Amino acid sequence: NMYFAMLSKVAFEDGKIVEHWDNLQEKPTQPNPSNRTMIDGTTEVKDLAKTEENKALVKSFVTDILVNGKMEKIANYFDGDNYIQHNPQIADGLSGLGKALEYMASQGITMRFHKIHKVLGEGNFVLTVSEGTFADKPTSFYDLFRVENGKIAEHWDVMETIIPEADRKNTNGKF
């Protein structure tokens, strides 16, 4: 059996679903190095008054670090090494993220974010929908962040290879 993790976004008009987008990734059978999975973790939405502030923080992080590669700014977005990671391959903390990026580089695996398409949020949760490449393949990135005390505290993600236009069943596009 194969199991998948999926992040979805849905557009409503007059209380009815009018559009749906999702990202789908095979869910590993084992937890990540910190014993976390792609589907566990905090779920309580709070700090509703900080929604716009949290969206701005996460957009700035994705722009500075993931799109523009300004790694010298990364510590500004986290509370030291306190960072809960749900990516199947990455351990908790900035140290875990650093080790994963070093390993990918040593294997010649590149990950590049080219464009943020959407930043959606409510309270302490912010979702970014981005486009780029992973291992030289066009990829869509759905990254869900939990913000606490003005810092990124937790992260989930689902990456999906974007199929070529010639293989698509419609012209709606991924974004």
Feature locations, PLM:
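C-terminal and inter-domain tail/linker signature
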Residues: N1-F175
